[in-house]
Amino acid sequence: MTSFQEVPLQTSNFAHVIFQNVAKSYLPNAHLECHYTLTPYIHPHPKDWVGIFKVGWSTARDYYTFLWSPMPEHYVEGSAVNCELAFQGYYLPNDDGEFYQFCYVTHKGEIRGASTPFQFRAASPVEELLTMEDEGNSDMLVVTTKAGLLELKIEKTMKEKEELLKLIAVLEKETTQLREQVGRMERELNHEKERGDQLQAEQKALTKVSQSLKMENEEFKKRYNDVTSKALQLEEDIVSVTHKAIEKETELDSLKDKLKKAQCEREQLECQLKTEKDEKELYKVHLKNTEIENTKLVSEVQTLKNLDGNKENMITHFKEEISRLQFSLAEKENLQRTFLLTTSSKEDTFILKEQLRKAEEQIQATRQEAVFLAKELSDAVNVRDKTMADLHTAHLENEKVKKQLTDALAELKLSAVNKDQEKTDTLEHELRREVEDLKLRLQMAADHYKEKFKECQRLQKQINKLSDQSANSNSVFTKKIGSQQKVNDASINTDPAATASTVDVKPLPSTAETDFDNLTKGQVSEMTKEIADKTEKYNKCKQLLQDEKTKCNKYADELAKMELKWKEQVKIAENIKLELAEVVDNYKLQLAEKEKEISGLTSYWENLSREKEHKRSVENQAERKLEGQNSQSPHQISQCLKTSSEKSGHVPAVSNTQPVLQYGNPYATPETRDGADGAFYPDEIQRPPVRVPSWGLEDNVVCSQPARNLSRPDGLEDPEDSKEDEKVPTAPDPPSQHLRGHGTGFCFDPSFDVQKKCPLCELMFPPNYDQSKFEEHVESHWKVCPMCSEQFPPDYDQQVFERHVQTHFDQNVLNFD
């Protein structure tokens, strides 16, 4: 029991003194009474004091006013004492709106008690109002002032006072009557004295009563024996119950260990399930990303295939042109020889020089085209290298994500294990507390049983003493009765005076007998009460034992239910393990397939790079051949041209139109994109090569609009444009057609000498205005993304444009929707 008493001492020192009946507010300058109770945990001292502190105090010196606590009278250690103090009104604080509280401070300066907060407030008119129910049972509330209510109470008290005065008068009359009754009773007492003769009959009755008391004493002895036997049986039951409780505790400990193991396994399985679900989601995301990357790579491979095919076509076309030019050069040499033999006029030589110059320019243009093709091949190789680098970075990022996944899974497992440990610790603490509570109850029951056993022994001793006293009193009583009979026999032969004296002496033994009877009756009644109390306590102990047995049975049932639930959860966890193992195997198979696809793509990239290197070497050889052929003397070319012109009858006009490149000029400066999405701009696809400025044909551009991002998602070239490119003539055109088709790369006929006009703002520029500045002006009207440099038309929706820009800053990098 001492452990239960020490808990509040250690927990709170402010509860050692309890303040009673503390109101929420007091009047500022009115008399204030403070009632408090000293608990057994504090020892009062004459230097202890009670102070009024403002709420928020930090030390015992922050008091507003105080009074010395008086020492309680008749104080007994270990008992609670009620005390009272009275604070005078002029020492109290004014109505300042602050909260105060009473605090009990010891002579050592320790604060051992604090009251609830209160205020000092002057009475407001609203506070003077009170609500009370109507006395006429009309379910109405009547609002009155305190003064009116007090007046009503005073009137009632005055009426009660008058009634009490009337009652006093009546009671005085009754006292006179009672005095008369006392006199009458005294007379009756005298009459009762005359009834002394009846006492002898009562003595005979008392003898019978004493015999009955003996019988009752024997019955009490029997009851005592029964109680002792029951107490012994109870002790045996307590011993058996303690053994059973110990067995149950051992069973509880074993079941708790099983339960802890089951819970740990359950939590581990839950953590595994959660981690595997997370892995499943991550695998899904990874598969989605890999599929998107594969589609991108396939599209890029397709575009590169198309580029390679187009470049092969261009190479074959240029080879055919080279062979045709070689054949034409041979024919021209023959013609020149024949022409030199036939004609030698100055005009013909001038025409031949012009033709020779044009042929040289055409050869130079073909060289530039070959250089452009080489540059295109180098660009394709760079794109291939870039895609390979992107693949490598993707692999590295994949490995990094896998490492992060493993780290996150390890952290999740650690957190789950810590949570399980905390739960098991709390459960173990609660179970230990319950076991200690049961042990305390059993100890208390054993102590209670020992006390009862001691009380039974004490009662047995009292019964033995009473039996001895009753035997002695019976012997004395029989002796007195014998002496009384002798006196009665002697009084028969004496005078009436002697008989009167004997009559006076007879009541003495009757008073002793009545005292003895009263004592025996009182002792018997006390013993019966004690026996009844003992039986009640015995029944209570028995009930407690039954309650403990029922609790043990309940715990056993609960543990059985927990075992069943644990087995079910183990089965569910095993099934989940099997399902997760299947899912993991499927994902591993899918990952292996994806890795095979990636390895196949990488090998395909390597093959493409080898083929491109081979094509580059072939193109270099072709360029060398062209350079060797173009190094012939211009004299031979002029002769060839003369002979051909004489045979045909007219001067051949060299075609001024350049063959349109299908994949753009690599030396141009377009706004490049990333290239990872596989889309190219139209100006990268179809843009004519830079023409030689010495041809003498000026371009009067009226309107020019820069290329925009109008690429097709499924292919890199427009079928209509490709058809038009196929229709471009390679044969020499007449001079008129040459002059008209000279500016086909722009939107208007250059024969018109018109000013340049912006197609968006309709601003006019002079004909000799710089073309690059004009294009910069036109491009300034378009919206350009600051991240990917993608261009949008001026009338493009601003919200859609901002949403496009915000996608570059989206935190969810894996979101490709």
Curated annotation (Swiss-Prot):
Segments traversing the membrane: none
Biased amino acid composition, Polar residues: 628-643
InterPro entries in the cross-refs: CALCOCO1-like, CALCOCO1/2_Zn_UBZ1, SKICH, UBA_autophagy_assoc_protein
* Disulfide cross-links: none
**What are the record keywords, sorted?**
Apoptosis, Coiled coil, Cytoplasm, Cytoplasmic vesicle, Metal-binding, Mitochondrion, Phosphoprotein, Repeat, Zinc, Zinc-finger
Residue positions, PTM Phosphoserine: S124, S138, S617, S633, S694
According to the UniProt entry, which residue ranges have a biased composition of type Basic and acidic residues? 609-627
Q: Where are the zinc fingers (UBZ1-type)?
A: 755-781, 782-808
Annotated region (Disordered) at 609-685, 704-742
UniProt KW NAD keyword: no
Post-translation: what modifications? Phosphorylated in the C-terminal region by CHUK/IKKA leading to NF-kappa-B signaling down-regulation.
Annotated signal sequence is none
Can you name a GO cellular component term?
Answer: phagophore assembly site
Q: Where is this region: Oligomerization?
A: 320-420
Please provide, alphabetically and separated by semicolons, the GO molecular function terms listed in this UniProt record.
kinase binding; protein-macromolecule adaptor activity; zinc ion binding
Superkingdom of source: Eukaryota
Q: Tell me which stretches of the chain form a coiled coil.
A: 144-628
Instruction: Give the binding site residues for Zn(2+) 2.
Output: C785, C788, H804, H808
Entry annotated with the keyword Phosphoprotein: yes
Q: Where does Zn(2+) 1 bind?
A: C758, C761, H777, H781
Q: Show the CDD domains listed in the entry.
A: Zn-C2H2_TAX1BP1_rpt1, Zn-C2H2_TAX1BP1_rpt2
* Localization: Cytoplasm; Mitochondrion; Preautophagosomal structure; Cytoplasmic vesicle, Autophagosome
**PANTHER family for the chain:** SKICH DOMAIN-CONTAINING PROTEIN, TAX1-BINDING PROTEIN 1
Job of this protein? Ubiquitin-binding adapter that participates in inflammatory, antiviral and innate immune processes as well as selective autophagy regulation. Plays a key role in the negative regulation of NF-kappa-B and IRF3 signalings by acting as an adapter for the ubiquitin-editing enzyme A20/TNFAIP3 to bind and inactivate its substrates. Disrupts the interactions between the E3 ubiquitin ligase TRAF3 and TBK1/IKBKE to attenuate 'Lys63'-linked polyubiquitination of TBK1 and thereby IFN-beta production.
The entry's protein name is Tax1-binding protein 1 homolog
Q: From what organism does this protein derive?
A: Bos taurus
